[in-house]
């Protein structure tokens, strides 16, 4: 289910302000955030955002294809180690 058309896309205010400030200064620093639910805006293109996965911050380089998606979509929170083979138990 998508977000209502009456509502604007969500982005954390602090994150947006940091990106806008860096765009004004021409800087490219890594920005740490815990806001996995923030929508990626076109202003974020070219920046690296460190998104929290529950135990560490994972750097995500934002490209044009990511605009409109959420930051949390690009960072996995669970590790899958696979199932054991039945032959290994014997």
UniProtKB/Swiss-Prot annotation:
A single GO BP: ribosomal small subunit assembly
Coiled coil region boundaries: none
Any one GO cellular component localisation term in the record: small ribosomal subunit
Pfam families for this protein: Ribosomal_S19 (PF00203)
InterPro entries in the cross-refs: Ribosomal_uS19, Ribosomal_uS19_bac-type, Ribosomal_uS19_CS, Ribosomal_uS19_SF
Family from the record: Belongs to the universal ribosomal protein uS19 family.
Function: Protein S19 forms a complex with S13 that binds strongly to the 16S ribosomal RNA.
Protein's name in the database: Small ribosomal subunit protein uS19
Annotated source species: Clostridium beijerinckii (strain ATCC 51743 / NCIMB 8052) (Clostridium acetobutylicum)
């Amino acid at each position: 289910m998508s977000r209502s058309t009456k509502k604007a896309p969500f982005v954390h205010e602090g994150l947006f302000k940091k990106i806008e400030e860096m765009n004004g200064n021409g800087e490219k620093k890594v920005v740490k955030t815990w806001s996995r639910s923030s929508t990626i805006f076109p202003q974020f293109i070219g920046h690296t955002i460190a998104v929290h996965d529950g135990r560490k911050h994972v750097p995500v380089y934002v490209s044009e294809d990511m605009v409109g998606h959420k930051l949390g979509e690009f960072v996995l929170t669970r590790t899958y180690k696979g199932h054991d083979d039945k032959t290994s138990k014997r």
